[in-house]
């Protein structure tokens, strides 16, 4: 009774000490503490298993300890599978703390393999996890057991580390490159080889225990040892394509194992993947740049061919792709540049998102013969050439039909309004004429760089009352062309002259009507482009 009083006083004193305010731990601290506890528990279980195995080996060497060895064999067999489950891959080791067992392998910013605890610590504090806590004892205890893991490591190194994997995002599961340590297909190969090595050791150790005279061990070892050996000796192969290398094994509707590629293909398309799509190299994504990637001999060739999507090669590859894309898109406008009369051979090389390179210096020069051309066939090709010039630079952006008026975007007033404001109405027109003054005049003989507006086209329909001769399909002629027919009325035969003038006038009106229809179609195309 008196002995229990101090314990009760200690229990009553606990709430008083807990009244002291404490800082609440953050989520990162809780995760790091949980990982530390799990890693410490895994280390203690590994040490306990190691001590049990050493004690069993020592007792098995003594002649008089057969009965005690057979009695303790069952607990060791029960605890060994748990230690095998803790060690996910025997070929890995944390580059920071050196541990070989972790629930999740991570990668450091340099590409090295680290355990889950070191990865969470680095993610939370941006500092490498300190390793001088209890590592001296664990390192001293972990040095004796490598006979079991050395065989597995040797088999994995012989089968995977000296492989022919090209690296750089293309993997064939054999290893041998710089970044193969974290490849899922390579990890699967290591896991299979490690399982086979462990099963072989367990079977040999089971046969060694079977020679003991204890009957209980002879009954247990034949039942437990051959099962993992049979399961590990059979490699898993895809039911569809037959491959044995894949980053993730899946199952079809019947439960057969299939590779990741066949499973995704069936999930997306609803049918099995054709066998001719099978490839010997697996292309995987590079989320983290592996260490010393630039020193890999295959990095340059793979990045130039486009098979690798590594982050360090992405800027050059993207720039090269943009250059090729622009070169392909600008192949058609290059022909138009060579066909331009005032264009030199060196066409401007602009960025793909820059304004279209257009030379406006030869635009007015090429459009001058429209008003002063001697014949009709000379004016039509010029008009078509100007229209082709208008929509040729824009064709690389997907616009195929653009009228010539889109070249001069600023448009505030029509040419007819500008002409009426600049010059008064000429006195040479007939009294009964209701038409507007001509667009071109002697003061401004050079025509503008674009066609007239819709209002000027519609107002030109009253041109029937003007007795003038015009043989080109360009704009209405200047004043000196309209003044030229003035000396013709005082002719000896006015009837024949009027008949000839009516025929010429009819032909001229038909040509002008066709010209106005063409201009109206151009305006309609321009309006259609503006509505888009």
Curated annotation (Swiss-Prot):
Q: Zinc fingers (GATA-type): which spans?
A: 94-118, 238-262
What the entry lists under InterPro entries is as follows: Transcription_factor_GATA (IPR039355), Znf_GATA (IPR000679), Znf_NHR/GATA (IPR013088)
Q: Which cysteines are joined by disulfide bonds?
A: none
Question: Positions of the region Disordered?
Answer: 56-87, 131-153, 202-227, 291-318, 422-506
Q: Which UniProt keywords apply?
A: DNA-binding, Metal-binding, Nucleus, Repeat, Transcription, Transcription regulation, Zinc, Zinc-finger
Molecular-function GO terms, alphabetical: DNA-binding transcription factor activity, RNA polymerase II-specific; RNA polymerase II cis-regulatory region sequence-specific DNA binding; zinc ion binding
Coarse class of the protein's main subcellular location: nucleus
Indicate where this protein resides in the cell.
Nucleus
Q: Does the keyword Zinc-finger apply?
A: yes
Q: Name one Pfam family in it.
A: GATA
Q: Single GO cellular component annotation?
A: nucleus
Amino acid composition bias (Polar residues), ranges on this chain: 59-87, 295-312, 430-444, 452-462
Gene3D superfamilies, per database record: Erythroid Transcription Factor GATA-1, subunit A
- Give GO terms for biological process: negative regulation of transcription by RNA polymerase II; positive regulation of transcription by RNA polymerase II
Q: What is this protein called?
A: GATA factor SREP
Q: Read off the lineage from the record.
A: Eukaryota, Fungi, Dikarya, Ascomycota, Pezizomycotina
